[in-house]
């Protein structure tokens, strides 16, 4: 596995356009743990090939492909063995996306779920690349305009939700377990309950909790907690919080554990991420 210090990658974020974050990675063979993002994610493959595991399927992405990943959905996109790939990611604030969708469909959407996962549309791909270029140039107003124009056909064709007045699907007992575990883990990232404590609260075996949680989310409770901690750490780094404080506030026992986990989920060190973000402020 290649060192993260050798990966040619960059992040873009600016408080002048807070609903957008971009990541660009070039000629990388680095693999990722299964993870999720709070944002709606759109990826674009510029070079090489990628295998993306998402919603219990594996998608073979090639140059020119776009992939849509819904908020909070576990996934992993990794290169073919011994190969490299180059790609861009756009991470779009979910509430902002829902407002944009509502403007097109005429009613407020409550959840964001695209009916299409992989799309090959050469014209849309070029528009995507143009948005990324504008972001890194710092042309904020133009980037925002072109981003909204690029997204409009995506919203209309693939992401229009059903009206919220439709009856909700029934919940199973395992989903109640999963909901309880998620809420307890997210309630206090610094002092999250142990699996033993959760087992006592739910009157279930630890193995049962892990199995039900994995069935409903695609990942284990510990993987979910680590992912949540890293996402929170990224938000603190965007605000300029010192690394030592980010580690503690995100719930990591020490800097070493924080550093290792951050690399596993982002293929960047916390310092690399922070420096790349602040280059655009």
Model-predicted regions and their roles:
Residues 183-187, 192-197, 204, 214-259, ...:
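Terminal helix-turn-helix DNA-binding modules in bacterial transcription factors
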Residues 162-169, 212-217:
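Short, Lys/Arg-enriched N-terminal segment that forms or immediately precedes the first helix
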Residues 64, 209-213, 257-258, 262:
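Short hydrophobic/aromatic patch on the recognition helix
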Residues 3-109:
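N-terminal regulatory/effector-sensing and dimerization cores
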Residues 104-166, 183:
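Amphipathic alpha-helical segments enriched in hydrophobic/aromatic residues interleaved with Lys/Arg
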Residues 48, 56, 218, 251, ...:
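Conserved phosphate-binding and hydrolysis motifs of nucleotide-dependent enzymes
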């Amino acid at each position: 596995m290649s060192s993260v210090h050798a990966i040619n990658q960059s992040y873009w974020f600016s408080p002048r356009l807070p609903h957008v974050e971009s990541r660009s990675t070039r000629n990388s063979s680095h693999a990722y743990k299964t993870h999720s993002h709070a944002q709606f994610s759109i990826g674009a493959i510029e070079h090489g090939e990628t295998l993306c595991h998402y919603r219990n399927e594996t998608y073979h992405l090639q140059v020119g492909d776009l992939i849509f990943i819904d908020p909070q959905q576990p996934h992993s996109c990794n290169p073919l063995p011994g190969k490299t790939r180059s790609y861009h990611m756009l991470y779009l604030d979910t509430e902002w996306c829902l407002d944009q969708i509502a403007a097109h469909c005429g009613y407020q959407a409550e959840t964001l779920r695209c009916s299409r996962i992989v799309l090959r549309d050469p014209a849309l791909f070029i528009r995507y690349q143009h948005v990324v270029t504008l972001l890194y140039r710092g042309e904020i107003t133009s980037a925002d305009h072109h981003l909204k124009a690029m997204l409009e056909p995506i919203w209309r064709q693939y992401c229009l939700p059903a009206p919220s007045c439709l009856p909700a699907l029934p919940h199973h007992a395992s989903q109640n377990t999963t909901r309880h575990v998620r809420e307890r883990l997210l309630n206090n990232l610094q002092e999250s309950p142990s699996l033993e404590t959760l087992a006592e609260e739910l009157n279930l075996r630890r193995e049962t909790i892990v199995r039900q949680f994995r069935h409903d989310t695609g990942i284990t409770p510990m993987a979910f907690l680590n992912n949540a901690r890293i996402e929170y750490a990224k938000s603190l780094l965007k605000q300029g919080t010192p690394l030592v404080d980010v580690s503690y506030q995100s719930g990591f026992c020490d800097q070493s554990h924080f550093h290792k986990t951050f690399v596993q989920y982002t293929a960047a060190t916390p310092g690399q991420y922070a420096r790349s973000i602040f280059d655009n402020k």
